[in-house]
Amino acid sequence: MVTRSRCTEDEYAAEMKFLLQRLPVDPSACEGVIVCSVVPRLTGVLAAACKRLTGREALVVNYTLDTGLTFAVDEPAKVGRDRIADAAAAAEHYPLPCMTVDLGTATTYNVISNKSAFLGGFIVPGVQTSLRAISAGTAQLPPIAPEPPEHLIGANTVAALNNGAMFGTAAMLDGLADRVEAELGQPLTVVATGGLAPYIMPCCKRKIIYDADLLFKGLALIWERNGK
């Protein structure tokens, strides 16, 4: 479901109803609702739409909930809700310390200590965001859709753009993981999620665990701890 800032509560409720009907799921049968929004002005709208559709008050993800984590960062209230969910899932399901990598609009890295403390991480432009920016900001570089690279060195402009994005992201992932591991002084588990993760992982030198459902596992965990 695409986030549109001008949509109303009613419009979101109608769209959610349509999506649930396709599954099919009866909205009135929902036991609970959890909202993980990184668009603050829409959080209340989405929560209200969920209540209108299901009759249930939505649980909104934030750092004050029981997530299984402690937050060793300067401003925990400003940590993205999606990052909280990813980190909560990693702390529950994977050996610690752990670094999660979510390859979305932004590529977000979250570091969780061996005591389940959220230590912070890194945020960089996502692969597709970077490719769009370089095309928009130059005269001769075309827009491209990222694809799994066939070779390391790009033999034409499109391949050079694609391989730069793929192998560049992989090199950054490997390099950051090595540095975090050295700083923590312990073996680091690295878990990747997001639609482009399967494209990036084969380009990495490190062992990377792929978990397509990491975010949803985190939301389920937070709901189990707080929503019932």
Task: List where the protein language model places each region.
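Glycine-rich phosphate-binding/hydrolytic loop that grips phosphoryl groups
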Residues: 84, 139, 166, 198, ...
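Generic secondary-structure signature for well-ordered alpha-helical cores
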Residues: 21, 25, 51, 55-56, ...
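Short glycine-aspartate micro-motif
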Residues: 34, 98-102, 191
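Phosphate-binding/catalytic loop of phosphoryl-transfer enzymes
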Residues: 48, 56-60, 65-137, 166-179, ...
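Short active-site-adjacent structural elements
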Residues: 109, 199-203
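Adenine-nucleotide phosphate-binding core of ATP-dependent small-molecule kinases
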Residues: 5, 149-189, 196, 207-209
